[in-house]
Amino acid sequence: MSAQINNIRPEFDREIVDIVDYVMNYEISSKVAYDTAHYCLLDTLGCGLEALEYPACKKLLGPIVPGTVVPNGVRVPGTQFQLDPVQAAFNIGAMIRWLDFNDTWLAAEWGHPSDNLGGILATADWLSRNAVASGKAPLTMKQVLTGMIKAHEIQGCIALENSFNRVGLDHVLLVKVASTAVVAEMLGLTREEILNAVSLAWVDGQSLRTYRHAPNTGTRKSWAAGDATSRAVRLALMAKTGEMGYPSALTAPVWGFYDVSFKGESFRFQRPYGSYVMENVLFKISFPAEFHSQTAVEAAMTLYEQMQAAGKTAADIEKVSIRTHEACIRIIDKKGPLNNPADRDHCIQYMVAIPLLFGRLTAADYEDNVAQDKRIDALREKINCFEDPVFTADYHDPEKRAIANAITLEFTDGTRFEEVVVEYPIGHARRRQDGIPKLVDKFKINLARQFPTRQQQRILEVSLDRARLEQMPVNEYLDLYVI
């Protein structure tokens, strides 16, 4: 005899309620969070502008139906597109993530919280243009910064103690959840409607990490976040119509997220939602490289300079040893053929070989015309990683959040260079004073890729003056980026 099904509808899961209460009620008071969000905004937009240099990215942009122009539609930076908020969120999100050069959060789960800007900026611009058209006040860029801080916090706090990669799920599911909550609040949904929206995000089938790992590594990893943040806008708009939610989306026996996708485990939390994640987020400033390799690339650049001074070249190298942390080995320690740029920018051997050979690492170095140089694979074969448990412990320590790598070079003549250790990359919170000027330089370089000098200056005059930027209507700011 089968057991009777309990059909009493439960209250919303506590985890969902906490997200919604945070986006609706928490006041961001941290100056550090707003300072960081300001530079994060500029860096994220700049990453999107650089991606427009790559045809593989550009071919995915624009309306679903070519030629479609949406009245009061979202302006996609660096283009002439005028799109609905769902497709605009995909466009902006894909641009941001394409080159793996935007911010990073490392914990039990990894991710790139500025991916959420796709949905946030698209929604804010769409709302602003429609408000102006009907004689109402538009949203300001301060509201965008607030949304960014909250989306960073939701994604990052869940990621602190909960590893989705361990069960084969991609971190973009957290982009979907965070963007849904923030966008729903931005759209003016009621508490019940935001609860519904967030539950809808959790009951979606979530993206697999298949496309991030050998032997299937591919370009979906560059547009997966755009897909997630655009899905968030769609779900929030559906909830706005009164579409129902699913209260025990996480905890329902058999059918909920925990039982279906998380091996029956519940989420663990290290801290309540505040502004911790934005304050401590990592920026990729010098190199477009998967973040676990950033300090290794920095060390390799130092070693390249030492080789130059000693009259040596990469051809003289016998062996390269990388002392690293466990996450680095699990994600990017890769041998064998590398099939495409997406494969190469997730291989620490490739990302160390390029600076040892050429004294640089740029996005262009992942392309086929560079990768065909046989010296790269020859050097990759000489590079080996091994875990240092201390580096792994420091990586997980919330007071340190180190991403340490150490490289030793041994040469064919029997000599060796002293090990070069880099614990914190220049984009780390501990190196903000060094990093921010370089981050601004990166933004300026990316503006110059797309805009004439006069337009660059107009963008910079507003963008570098935070007080002025915060007061500016979202639609007016994005108008500055139209080509």
Curated annotation (Swiss-Prot):
It comes from the Bacteria. It catalyses: (2S,3S)-2-methylcitrate = 2-methyl-cis-aconitate + H2O; citrate = D-threo-isocitrate. GO terms for molecular function: 2 iron, 2 sulfur cluster binding; 2-methylcitrate dehydratase activity; aconitate hydratase activity. Pathway: Organic acid metabolism; propanoate degradation; Carbohydrate metabolism; tricarboxylic acid cycle; isocitrate from oxaloacetate: step 2/2. The keyword Transferase does not apply. The keyword Lyase applies. Gene3D superfamilies: 2-methylcitrate dehydratase PrpD (3.30.1330.120). Pfam families: MmgE_PrpD_C (PF19305), MmgE_PrpD_N (PF03972). Its EC number is 4.2.1.79, 4.2.1.3. Transmembrane segments: none annotated. Keywords: Lyase, Tricarboxylic acid cycle. SUPFAM superfamilies: 2-methylcitrate dehydratase PrpD. GO terms for biological process: propionate metabolic process, methylcitrate cycle; tricarboxylic acid cycle. Involved in the catabolism of short chain fatty acids (SCFA) via the tricarboxylic acid (TCA)(acetyl degradation route) and via the 2-methylcitrate cycle I (propionate degradation route). Catalyzes the dehydration of 2-methylcitrate (2-MC) to yield the cis isomer of 2-methyl-aconitate. Could also catalyze the dehydration of citrate and the hydration of cis-aconitate. Monomer. Belongs to the PrpD family. This is 2-methylcitrate dehydratase. The lineage of its organism: Bacteria, Pseudomonadati, Pseudomonadota, Gammaproteobacteria, Enterobacterales.
